[in-house]
Every structure is written in structure tokens, then in C-alpha cells.
Amino acid sequence: MKRALCLLLICLFCTGCSALPPEERAFCVVLLIDGGAQECTVRVRIPTYQQNGGYQTLSASGATLTDALRTLESAAPMRLHWGQLRLIVLSRAWAAEIPIVRTLSDLSGVENLRLHASVAVTEEDTAALAEKLVPENGTRLSKSIDVMVQARHEQGVIPTCAASVLLRFGSRQSPVLCGAESTADGFLLSGAWLTDADGLVRDFLPPEETQILLLMQGELTRTQLLLPEHAIHLTETSTSICLTEDTAVCRVNLRYDRADLTPQAVSAETAQACLDVLNRLQAAGCDALGLGRKAIWSAWSMADWRDSDFPARLQNLRWTVEVRSEPAA
């Protein structure tokens, strides 16, 4: 036994420790999709797995999204794993031509793909934008994206846009996607892209109008609300929407912290901001408030629901907004 141990120690001193085996798989953190009905180009950001860290971009093209992903898998230097996917970025050209539900359905067939990833749309070149996707110092890219998504949603400047949530909407609610852009400091998620009844991108809401949308969705509270003329700090909010055959009423209750504005002034300015956003939604044919979920209960069957032509009814609705404001105690 002692002789065997001595021989083992001699081997270690003479030959040293062997190198660790290289990574057998690469975790895809961001997927970018560009192209249209004739051709699709996909790009992924993966770690370099080098000692100094960093990320690299792999790309591939195909006739369809599925073909492009297969080409990417076969050409990758190691097996790709989708369990750490945090962000799916679609070019505006792609999102305006390919329905979002079709894109997400195709992606849901990818093995181990993380459908809790957020979905965004960009007007910028996806190849250039990919290089902007780098983590904050000392963090992983996946962690940086998680922190940004949470912070920006709490501020109300991006909508809830997880792929798994959007897939559940069906024909009862229109998906709203967040905006993606490059900045001098790197990468930013901001604003909301509206989709129509066919799931195609139609219009963009800037951050301040995205806040109003989230307020009407009941998702905005305890943050600064940027109204057209003033900014107020919300301390409490509640929202309800009532739908009849050809009218809809949005009721908003809010408490705010700003002593120099009267409740009447806050209510009037908030109501007008809501009406402006509702007009944008109607013009885009976007049911971001989920009125379809309410209307479907009046249908006797799915055939009756399809025959009701709810998208046309949505665009002809007459809206009333009632806002009740109270200063915080």
C-alpha cells in the first residue's frame, strides 16, 4: 500500500495534474431573430468559457426559424443548451411579418428552452445590438438581464412580456412586447410594442405611455408616474374595466404623494393620458387590456366567439375613463 502511494506521488510530481476537460455545452443567454417569411437569421450570445470571461455571438440562417435553429445547433462548436435563456429579441421586420404566437410556438419546441425569457422588439440591427449585450462588471449576463427586467417593470416602463405568459393569451388578449435598444452605456429595455389581432407588431408606446398602460392593467403601483404635464409618486392604485356591447369604462383609483397638485388636477390629467393611450390601442387593433377575456364569456360556443368578430368590435368601442385621486395621508 505504501509503495502504491509513493508511486502515485511520483507520477503527480513528474506529470502534473491534467487539464480540466473543456465545456461540453454552451448556455444560450440571449436569442436574437431577424428576417421574414423567406429567410430567418438567428443569433445567440453564449459565454466564451475563457479564463478572462466574456461573451461571443454565434449566428446561422435558414428558410424558417426552425431551420435556422437546426443549422445553428449543428454549426456550434459545442452543444447548445437553452435552459439559461433570459431574453428573446425580435427585429421589427420579423415581428411585423411573423405572428408572435407562431414564433413562440416554434421556440417552445426547442428542447429545454426556458420560456420564462422576456420577449423584446428592436428597430436596430440585431448583429450590432448583440455585441451590446454584455454584463455589468462582476456579474453574469443572465443576472444583469434579470435585474434590468425586474427594475424596469417595477418602474412601469416595460410590460410583462415573459414568453410563457404571452403564449397563454391565445385570442383573448393581445401580447405587448418590450422595446430593446442600444445606448452609450450598453443595452436598455424601454417602452412597449403593441400587436394586433393577428399577433403582428403595429405601434410603439414610449416609456411614459407604457406607464399609463400598466396603470390601466393594474400592474403599476408605488412608483413615479410621469404624466404629460407633471410627475407624481403613486402610493396605491386599483383599476377595473367594465365592458358592454359597444362601450367600455375604465375606472382608476389612486393615491399620490405631491402636495402642490389637487386631486381634481391629477384626475383630469390622468384621465386624458389614459384616453390618449386607449386611442393608440384602438388604432393598432391591440387588446392589451384583455377585453377579449371578458367578451368571450358572452359567447355560447367557440364557433359563436369566432363569428362575433371581436377585433372589429374592439376598434369601434366608445371609451369612458373615470379617475378618482386622493393625496396620500
Question: What do the PLM-derived regions correspond to, one by one?
Answer:
Residues 1-5:
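Bacterial N-terminal signal peptides that target proteins for export
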Residues 7, 11-329:
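Membrane-proximal alpha-helical signals and transmembrane carboxylates
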